[in-house]
Structure formats: structure tokens, C-alpha cells
Amino acid sequence: MVIITIALSLGMSLFSSPLLANTENNRTESRDKYLNIMTVNKPQYDMVKKIIKDKCNVQYMFTNEKDISEFKYSESVLNNISNMDLFIYSGTSFEPWSASLIDELKKGNLGIINLARGVRLLNYSNENNTKENPYYFEGIEEYKIALYNVKAAIQDRDPQNRDYYEDNYNIAIKEFDKNIKLYEDKLKSLSEYRFITLNNDFDYLTKSLNLNTIQLDNHEIAEFIKINNLDPKKVIIIVDGENGTKLDLSAYNTIKLWKYYGDMSFDDLILYNVKELSKWAKAKETTSVTTTSEA
């Protein structure tokens, strides 16, 4: 595996919720097709690996979100991606440069796959401004749709091995559903809590889990809790595991969740957040409990 970075310019040559798909009794597998696939980040790479296993070649460009955001592509990058069979990207502002990069690619035999196809994207609510929320991959159904898009794109490029990719997709979905189901009862018990969010970053996750949320406005946290008639003992404040917060929350229940973690697959990221939330199912009422777990 080669991690593609800006150093490509040095001259390295490399280059709707979907249900379980229907399968047939007769399985055939041909190994005469070898696809070269490029993804933007490592979690997308992990999605592809669930479908192809070791059959094809897949590479990724970045791990860190900051590197993705600040990326400036070169002619060498354009040429390398253009020589791939598939280029897979999130399809949102998570990769702010993706639209212009795609415009400059030499399409030829290159397939360009938008993972957000079929996903109902949410927006940030910021005064009179509406901005797209790119973190759809933290949502359960949204992740399934994205994985389905990966599977469908690979099947389209390698139809002779359609059944092989179909089976791998079904296995991945069943495993994911089984892991989430383990926490189903604990998640239901969270209905007694009110989750205060500091922004919209975790909207996909909280909606997926039907959490009772309320977003902090410009009031001080103590005043906000009082105005909204909230029980401080039954309030949990969601804090970004990466960015944290400058607010003094030492007197309140908090939980650290992650909207993106480059070294963790999207399904593992969802499961991590679910596990952290589930810890509150048996938590005793206290006046000050702080959760500081990190990925």
C-alpha cells in the first residue's frame, strides 16, 4: 500500500437506505480483472477493502482531516489519479478542492464515484447562513448508503466478479448491523438524558440514534440550562474529541465523540461513538461526571 501525499510531485509512478443486496445460488469468481482504485482518505480506503479484500489495488491520499482541507493538487497528482480505474471521494465540502480537481482530470477510462450519492445531506444552522454538513459518514444509514455506492461502482467496473463483491458487501453490512444491535437496549435507555450539542457536527449521529438533543445558543451554559428548564443531572454535553472546547464544563456531564478520525474506519468510528454513549446507560446520577475517553 502506498500513501499518496503531496510528495507525488517527486515523480513516484503509481499509479434510501440500501438493504442487503440480493444474491444468487450460483457463484462465479474471475481473477482476470485487476482494478486500480484511489480514495481521498484512509476510512474510504477501508470501505473499499471490505468489498474487494485483496482482489484489486487500492490506495489513499490522506489520513488527517487538516491535510485534506489544505491540500493543493499538482499536475502530477492529476496525472496519477487520471491513470486509475476509479477515484472515490466524499462528494461534500469535506474535500473543498474536489470539484476543481475533478474538472481537470483526464476522464478517459476513469470512473469518478461520489460516495454521498443518495445521502440526504444536512446543513449547518448559522444565523442567516446555511452551510453543508459534510460529516454524513458518522451516521448509520448514511454509512450504509456510501458502502453500497462503493460496491456498485466496483461491480460496474468488474461485472464478472459481481457475486464476489456482493457477498463481501452483505457480510460487511451484517457484521455492522450485528455490532450496533449489541447496544440497542442501552441506547434506548438514553432517552432520559438531554444532550447539549455545541454545533451541528454530530447531527448525523444523534439523528441516527434518536438522541434527545438541544443546541447551545449564545447564552452561558448555566443560564441556557436554566432557561430551557433542564435538569443538570440529566444533561450530557457532547464535546468534539479532536477540537475540544474553550467552555468551562467542569461542573457538567460531558462526553467526547469524534466526527472523523483518520486512522479509524467509518464503521469503527460509529461503533466507538455508540460505545461511548452506551456507557451512560448505567451511569449513576451525580452532580459532576466527566467522560474524557479518546480514540
Placement of each model-derived feature along the sequence:
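Hydrophobic membrane-insertion alpha-helices, especially the h-region
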Residues: I3-S13
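Extracytoplasmic metal-acquisition and chelation regions
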Residues: G11-A295
